Curated annotation (Swiss-Prot):
This protein's encoding gene: gcvP
Protein name as annotated: Glycine dehydrogenase (decarboxylating)
Enzyme superclass (EC): oxidoreductase
Keyword Repeat: no
GO biological process terms on file: glycine decarboxylation via glycine cleavage system
GO cellular component, one term: cytosol
Assembly, per entry: The glycine cleavage system is composed of four proteins: P, T, L and H.
Lineage: Bacteria, Pseudomonadati, Pseudomonadota, Alphaproteobacteria, Hyphomicrobiales
Keywords, ordered alphabetically: Oxidoreductase, Pyridoxal phosphate
Organism name: Rhizobium leguminosarum bv. trifolii (strain WSM2304)
Reaction equation(s) it catalyzes: N(6)-[(R)-lipoyl]-L-lysyl-[glycine-cleavage complex H protein] + glycine + H(+) = N(6)-[(R)-S(8)-aminomethyldihydrolipoyl]-L-lysyl-[glycine-cleavage complex H protein] + CO2
HAMAP family found in the cross-reference section: GcvP
Length: 954
C-alpha cells in the first residue's frame, strides 16, 4: 500500500497530443528501431539522412503545443467570431440539410474519410458503388450518357468543359463564348484558363451576341445567376451546325423540374452537387459534376467508375479508362486533375439514395414555392421582380435603396446579394423558413405573413421536365433510416481504410486524421458560412486562415501564401501561373520553357501544358538523382526562354538529393524560377525549408502533410507559398480583391477543412511537427532495413539512408517466379493491407511510405507480410509451389473461395490467413481480382440493371 510520504507526482502527460496520440512508436520502440537501423539516437539518424547544406538553421517554434481540449476551446473561440446569418446570396452556393444519417455515418466516419483513392479496386468496392450511384444520378438528371466521379468545383468544371470543347470541336476557331448570366466566379476561372492558351473569351447575351461560326464552344447557365431560365435548344443546334461544342452549367436541383441539358442537345453539362446535402462551408469542399455525350467520354477529365467482373465472373467496380489520366499521359493528358471530391460526391449520392426521386422533386418544388411567395410579397410592395419565370432565384430593382435594404436585411439576420448598384438578388433554398421570408419583407418595408399569399408556380411551361430520373432501384429501396444506415455500413465494410490498417502508399502520406481535428468541420460556425458573406461575418475564418498562413510561412521559408487552390494539382497550376505572370510583369512573357525530370509526378507536365508552357524533359541518373550535366545543358540551351523548372524534394525516389541547391542556382542564373513540388513535405517540416534552399514557389498538400483526410479520393487542399517577389502575382478573386487569376470558385478554396490543419499545428507545436518528421524518416528507414535481403531498396543516399519513403524492387520476382508487382499488391490484401504505390516512379516496383503515425507493431506486421510474400515467391522458384496456381496469382482470396469447393494445391489457411493477417478481425476482400481489360472493353459507367443485384445476392 502506498503511503502519503511515498506518493510522487508523475511527469507523464496523458494529453500530450504529439507524443501520446499522433506519433505511433513509443520512445522505447524508437530505441529498438534505431538499433535495427544502426543508430544510437534519432538525431543521429537525421544527421545521416539529410545533407547538411539543406538543414534549416533555427528550430521551428511557435508557442506551447495545446492539448486536444485546449485546441478545441481555441477553435470554439475562433468559430464564435463568425456570424451565422441566413444567406440567400446564391451564386452557386445554397443552404441545404445534411441528413443526420449521412453526417454521422459518412462525413464523420473514418471508414469513409480516411480511405485512399480507389486505384486498388478489390478493397474499394463500397466507395466505387457509391460513386457509381453518383454518376448514375448525374447522368439521369442531366440527360447525358457518361458522368465522371466528380471534379473540384463548378467553376473548375466549366473551365475543364471549355478545354474539352477546344479539343474535340470541329471548328478551328480560337474563341469561346460565355453567357453573361454565368456565375461571376465561373467567368473568372474560364478567363484564367483561356488566357495562357491564347483563347479569346467572349462574354455576352447568347441570344444577341453569339455567332456560332466564331467560336469553338459556348457555355450557358441554367438557370442563370440572376434567375433567368432560357431554352438553349436552338442555340445549341446552331453551334453544332458550326462545328462547335455546347456546355450547360445547370443547377442540379432545378433539373428535377426543368428540361435536362441532354434534351436540349447539349454536349456537356457541369455544375455543383453541393445542394444535395453538403454544407456550404465558406466555399467548400463540394463535388462538382460533369456529364458528356458518349462520343466525347475519352476526353473527359477526372476519374470514371465503371463496371467489370472479377476472376469468378462476379460483378466488380473499378476506375475505367485510366490511360487518359495525367499519371499516364503526362503533358498529353486531358487535364492535370488527379483529385476528385469523393467524400462529398458520396454524400451527394447518398442524399439522392435517401430521398429518392419523389423526395428530391418535393424539395425542389418547395424551394420554388418559397421563391414565388418571396416574389409576391415584394411585388405587393411595388418592386419589380425579375425574371417572370424562375426556379429559386429572383432579382429586384431597388434603385438608390440598395444599401439601405441590404443593411436592413443583415439586421434581420439575412444576407442578400448585391447586384450592380441598383439591384438585389436572392436565392431561396431547402433551409429557408417562413420567418426568413417575413424578415426579408420587413427589410424591404413590408409587414406581411406567409399566410397572406397563396403558393403557385412560375416555371416556364415549355421547359417543364417530363422525362423520368433516378429510376434505378437503388434510389427507391432505402427510405427507412434503419435500411439507410445498414446500406452505408455494408458499403464501408467492403473498403479498407486507415481505421483498419496502415496504408503504406508512397508519395501519399496516409497519416492519422485525429478525431479532435475533424470535430470542428461540422460546427455551424464553420459549415454554414456562405463564401461571399461580408468580411465582418467571417472574422473567425480570416483569423484562422491568417494564423495558418503565418505558420506555413514559418515551416517553408516563404513570404506569402494563397489558400485558394483546392487540390495539389490546382496548386501546381496556380504556382506556374504565378511564375508566368511574374515574367510577363517583367517584360519577359516569352519565357515559356519548363524543365521537368523524367521522374516527376504526371501532374507536373500536365500542369505546365495547361499554362501554355513547353515541357523539356531532363534525364535522371541510375541512382535516381537528377542528371546535373543534362540539367545544366538544357538550362543553358533554353536560357533565353527558360521560365522555370519543376522538381520534387525529397525526390520522387525517396532520397534527399545533395545537388538541389546547385539546381536552383542554375535555374536562377538562366533567368528562370524554381517550382518545388511540396508533395514530400512530410520529410522536411522542421528540418529543411524550401524557401531557404533556393525554391521560389511550392504547393503544400494539406491532405498529406497537414492531416486533412484523403476522403477516399478527395477533398484536398493545395495552397501555394511564394517568395516575396512572386507575392503580387498570386491568384486573385472577383469576390474579394477583384484581381484576375482565380483558380478556384471560392477565394479560400475548401475553407471548411482548414480547421483540421490549423488544429494539427496547434496541438503539435513546432517541436512536435519536427518530431513527427523525424519519426516519419525513422519508420521508413526501419522498413527499408527490415526488408533488406528479401528485396532490394532501389535508391539510397550516400550514407545508405532513405527519406520518408523507400522504393523496393519486385522486378526480379518476374524472372525468377513469374510473380508481378500486381501479384504482390493483391496478396497484401489477404494480409489486410492496402498495397504501397505500384510502378511509380519506376515500373515494377513498390514505393512504401509508413508515416509517423504507425506503431512499431503495425510496421512489423507489414514487414512480416512482405517477407512472407517473398518466401512464397521463393517456393515458386524452388518448385515447391505451382507457377500458375498459387496464393500470389490467385490473390485476393474471398469468403466465397474459403467456403467453396477447394481444388488448389495449397491450403485454405495458407490462402486466407497468411502471416500478418488478423484471424479474428480479418479484412475480407469482397471480390476476387478484378479484370481491368474487360472493364475498359465493356464500358458501363452507371448502375447495372436490378437483375444483376439479385444475381449478386444469390
Amino acid at each position: 500500500m502506498t503511503t502519503p510520504t511515498e506518493f510522487q507526482f508523475t511527469d507523464y502527460q496523458p494529453y500530450d497530443f504529439a507524443n501520446r496520440r499522433h506519433i505511433g512508436p513509443s520512445p522505447a520502440e524508437m530505441t529498438d528501431m534505431l538499433k535495427v537501423i544502426g543508430y544510437n539516437s534519432l538525431d543521429g539518424l537525421i544527421d545521416g539522412t539529410l545533407p547538411p547544406a539543406i538543414r534549416q538553421k533555427a528550430p521551428l517554434v511557435w508557442g506551447a503545443p495545446m492539448t486536444e481540449r485546449e485546441a478545441l476551446d481555441k477553435l470554439r473561440e475562433t468559430a464564435n467570431k463568425n456570424k451565422v446569418l441566413v444567406s440567400l446570396i446564391g451564386q452557386g452556393y445554397h443552404g441545404t440539410i445534411t441528413p443526420p444519417v449521412i453526417q454521422r455515418n459518412i462525413l464523420e466516419n473514418p471508414a469513409w474519410y480516411t480511405a485512399y483513392t480507389p486505384y486498388q479496386p478489390e478493397i474499394s468496392q463500397g466507395r466505387l458503388e457509391a460513386l457509381l450511384n453518383y454518376q448514375t444520378m448525374v447522368c439521369d438528371l442531366t440527360g447525358l450518357d457518361v458522368a465522371n466521379a466528380s471534379l473540384l468545383d463548378e467553376a473548375t468544371a466549366a473551365a475543364e468543359g471549355m478545354a474539352i470543347a477546344e479539343r474535340v470541336a470541329k471548328s478551328k476557331a480560337k474563341a469561346f463564348f460565355v453567357d453573361a448570366d454565368c456565375h461571376p466566379q465561373t467567368i473568372a476561372l474560364i478567363r484564367t484558363r483561356a488566357e495562357p492558351l491564347g483563347w479569346q473569351v467572349i462574354v455576352g447575351n447568347p441570344f444577341t451576341d453569339l455567332d456560332p461560326v466564331d467560336v469553338f464552344g459556348a457555355i450557358f447557365q441554367y438557370p442563370g445567376t440572376h434567375g433567368h431560365i432560357n431554352d438553349f435548344t436552338g442555340l445549341i443546334a446552331r453551334l453544332h451546325q458550326a462545328g462547335a461544342i455546347s456546355i450547360v452549367a445547370a443547377d442540379i436541383l432545378a433539373l428535377t423540374l426543368l428540361k435536362s441539358p441532354g434534351e436540349m442537345g447539349a454536349d456537356i453539362a457541369v455544375g455543383s452537387s453541393q445542394r444535395f446535402g453538403v454544407p456550404v462551408g465558406y466555399g467548400g469542399p463540394h463535388a462538382a459534376y460533369m456529364a458528356v455525350k458518349d462520343a466525347i467520354k475519352r476526353s473527359m477529365p477526372g476519374r470514371l467508375v465503371g463496371v467489370s467482373v472479377d476472376a469468378r465472373g462476379n460483378r466488380a467496380y473499378r476506375l475505367s479508362l485510366q490511360t487518359r489520366e495525367q499519371h499516364i499521359r503526362r503533358e498529353k493528358a486531358t487535364s492535370n486533375i488527379c483529385t476528385a471530391q469523393v467524400l462529398l460526391a458520396v454524400m451527394a449520392s447518398m442524399y439522392a439514395v435517401f430521398h429518392g426521386p419523389k423526395g428530391i422533386k418535393a424539395i425542389a418544388q418547395q424551394v420554388h414555392q418559397k421563391a414565388v411567395l418571396m416574389a409576391k410579397g415584394l411585388e405587393k410592395l411595388g418592386y419589380k421582380v425579375e425574371p417572370e419565370s424562375f426556379f429559386d432565384t429572383i432579382t429586384v430593382d431597388v434603385g438608390h435603396m440598395q444599401g439601405l435594404i441590404l443593411r436592413a436585411a443583415v439586421a434581420e439576420g439575412v444576407n442578400l446579394r448585391k447586384v450592380g448598384d441598383t439591384h438585389i438578388g436572392m436565392s431561396l433554398d431547402e433551409r429557408t423558413r417562413p420567418a426568413t421570408l417575413e424578415a426579408v419583407w420587413r427589410a424591404f418595408g413590408g409587414n406581411f405573413k406567409i399566410a397572406d399569399f397563396e403558393p403557385s408556380y412560375r416555371l416556364p411551361k415549355g421547359l417543364l421536365r417530363t422525362s423520368d430520373y433516378l429510376t434505378h432501384p437503388i434510389f427507391h429501396m432505402n427510405r427507412a433510416e434503419s435500411e439507410m444506415t445498414r446500406y452505408i455500413r455494408r458499403l464501408s465494410d467492403r473498403d479498407l481504410a486507415l481505421d483498419r490498417s496502415m496504408i503504406p502508399l508512397g508519395s501519399c502520406t496516409m497519416k492519422l486524421n485525429a478525431t479532435a481535428e475533424m470535430l470542428p468541420i461540422t460546427w455551424p460556425e464553420f459549415s454554414d458560412i456562405h463564401p461571399f458573406v461580408p468580411a465582418d461575418q467571417a472574422l473567425g475564418y480570416r483569423e484562422m486562415i491568417d494564423d495558418l498562413i503565418e505558420k506555413l510561412c514559418a515551416v517553408t521559408g516563404y513570404d506569402a501564401f494563397s489558400m485558394q487552390p483546392n487540390s495539389g494539382a490546382q496548386g501546381e497550376y496556380a504556382g506556374l501561373l504565378t511564375i508566368r505572370n511574374f515574367h510577363i510583369a517583367n517584360g519577359e512573357g516569352h519565357r515559356d520553357v519548363c524543365l521537368i525530370p523524367t521522374s516527376a509526378h504526371g501532374t507536373n507536365p500536365a500542369s505546365a501544358q495547361m499554362v501554355g508552357m513547353k515541357v523539356v524533359v531532363v534525364k535522371v541518373r541510375e541512382n535516381g538523382d537528377i542528371d546535373l550535366d543534362d540539367f545544366r545543358a538544357k538550362a543553358e540551351e533554353h536560357a533565353a526562354n527558360l521560365s522555370c523548372c519543376m522538381i520534387t524534394y525529397p525526390s520522387t525516389h525517396g532520397v534527399f538529393e545533395e545537388t538541389v541547391k546547385e539546381i536552383c542556382d542554375l535555374v536562377h542564373a538562366n533567368g528562370g524560377q524554381v517550382y518545388l513540388d511540396g508533395a514530400n513535405m512530410n520529410a522536411m517540416v522542421g528540418l529543411s525549408r524550401p524557401g531557404d534552399i533556393g525554391s521560389d514557389v511550392s504547393h503544400l498538400n494539406l491532405h498529406k502533410t497537414f492531416c486533412i483526410p484523403h476522403g477516399g479520393g478527395g477533398p484536398g487542399m493545395g495552397p501555394i507559398g511564394v517568395k516575396a517577389h512572386l507575392a503580387p502575382h498570386l491568384p486573385g478573386h472577383p469576390e474579394t480583391d477583384g484581381r484576375p487569376g482565380a483558380v478556384s470558385a471560392a477565394a479560400f478554396g475548401s475553407a471548411s477543412i482548414l480547421p483540421i490543419s490549423w488544429s494539427y499545428c496547434l496541438m503539435m507545436g513546432g517541436e512536435g511537427l519536427t518530431q513527427a518528421t523525424k519519426v516519419a524518416i525513422l519508420n521508413a528507414n526501419y522498413i527499408a532495413t527490415r526488408l533488406k535481403g528479401a528485396y532490394d531498396v532501389l535508391y539510397k543516399s550516400k550514407t545508405g539512408r532513405v527519406a520518408h519513403e523507400c522504393i523496393i524492387d519486385t522486378r526480379p520476382l518476374v524472372d525468377s517466379a513469374g510473380v508481378t508487382v500486381d501479384d504482390v499488391a493483391k496478396r497484401l490484401i489477404d494480409c489486410g493491407f492496402h498495397a504501397p504505390t505500384m510502378s511509380w516512379p519506376v515500373a515494377g516496383t513498390l514505393m512504401i511510405e509508413p508515416t509517423e503515425s504507425e506503431t512499431k507493431a503495425e510496421l512489423d506486421r507489414f514487414c512480416e507480410a512482405m517477407l512472407a510474400i517473398r518466401e512464397e515467391a521463393r517456393a515458386i522458384e524452388d518448385g515447391r509451389m505451382d507457377k500458375v496456381n498459387n496464393p500470389l496469382k490467385n490473390a485476393p482470396h474471398t469468403v466465397e473461395d474459403l467456403v467453396g469447393e477447394w481444388d488448389r494445391p495449397y491450403s485454405r489457411e495458407q490462402a486466407c490467413f497468411p502471416p500478418g493477417a488478423f484471424r479474428v478481425d480479418k479484412y475480407w476482400s469482397p471480390v476476387n481480382r478484378v479484370d481491368n481489360v474487360y472493364g475498359d472493353r465493356n464500358l458501363i459507367c452507371t448502375c447495372p440493371p436490378v437483375e444483376s443485384y439479385a444475381e449478386a445476392a444469390e
